[in-house]
């Protein structure tokens, strides 16, 4: 299994729609000259952005967080501000701007950007499995005792693409994975 380069990422995006919308280079500056947290193609990965749609966790109902019986009322929706404030020691969910179509022979690993990590904000994303497609649900944990800010439409994490020497017998699509084709911020599904 080998990691794929910027050339491969560009080719797969252009010829197979692997990432839409796609940015062929690193974007570090907005059109108005303001600095951005970078996104787009890097040497051996793709820096993804989060959309301006967030679900911020609150414990107003004093519930237990149970992945088999998750209470959607534990979240407050935030959108249209261009950013999200995560309360201290809490978390928020968001989705990517980019829609992904992962080839059958590819598995991705996603890692948070150092800009956020150095501020105590951890980005968690599970692997994109072979033949999975959809918008990615992102989880941001604020590990600090202070409120933390996440910027929409700027880089939040980097996706690394690994291609296997042979295709898998059963892909995510074949087994009808429960998050196949997700379009919004998707809560846990039992």
Curated annotation (Swiss-Prot):
Record's keyword annotation contains rRNA-binding: no
Reaction(s) catalysed by this chain's protein: dCTP + H2O + H(+) = dUTP + NH4(+)
Keywords from the UniProt entry: Hydrolase, Nucleotide metabolism, Nucleotide-binding
Pathway this chain belongs to: Pyrimidine metabolism; dUMP biosynthesis; dUMP from dCTP (dUTP route): step 1/2
Gene3D superfamilies: 2.70.40.10
EC number in record: 3.5.4.13
InterPro entries: dCTP_deaminase (IPR011962), dUTPase-like_sf (IPR036157), dUTPase_trimeric (IPR033704)
EC top class named in words: hydrolase
Stored Pfam families: DCD (PF22769)
Any one biological process term the GO annotation gives: dUTP biosynthetic process
Function summary: Catalyzes the deamination of dCTP to dUTP.
Similarity annotation: Belongs to the dCTP deaminase family.
Subunit structure: Homotrimer.
Name of protein: dCTP deaminase
Organism: Chromobacterium violaceum (strain ATCC 12472 / DSM 30191 / JCM 1249 / CCUG 213 / NBRC 12614 / NCIMB 9131 / NCTC 9757 / MK)
Organism taxonomic ancestry: Bacteria, Pseudomonadati, Pseudomonadota, Betaproteobacteria, Neisseriales
Gene responsible for this protein: dcd
